[in-house]
Amino acid sequence: LLTLWMLALLPYCISAQNDAKATEVLDKTLEVLSGENGIRADFGGTENGFLLLKGEKFYLNNGNIQSWYDGETQWSYVADTEEVNISHPTPEELQSINPYLILMRYKTDFNYSYKGELTRNGAKGHEVILKPKRGRSAEIIRVFISKTYQPLAMKVDQNGKTLSEINITSFRTDQHLEDGMFRFNKSLYPNAEVIDLR
């Protein structure tokens, strides 16, 4: 009878171990992402570009669209239309623009589990699954993290189909990023039409 109970509880014990391992991997990844001098990540996949990150501040450039966020205000510049929108984005809006914010809020916004070790982009690492706690219930975010706790890739699936995928092609820490890099500089875009949505 005791053996039967132990077998019945086994999936819950494994799940608890996976959650502990996921927490360990994600926390160590956040330490890397939170470097006081900032990081630069170049990426490809559904979109190509690069991201500068320092705490919650970021600058994202994917060619046609550039976004600056200084921790309060966001500026989004569209090269095709020469328009810049200014807003105070919600946490959900920020996560859709800057995928690293998903990792920064994993404990509050997601249920998470450790999937296992794997090789991705030629590097050995970990796979962690994130599922939103509310809304977007069919969405699954797969995060691939290297053995040195640097993000390798992120994939968003919904109902068995891939919505987006980002592969990190270069990841550099200790970038000495100045705070001014996270604010739109109108003098560099003199023809831009400013649309203030705040």
Task: Give each language-model segment a name.
Residues 2-11:
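Bacterial N-terminal signal peptides
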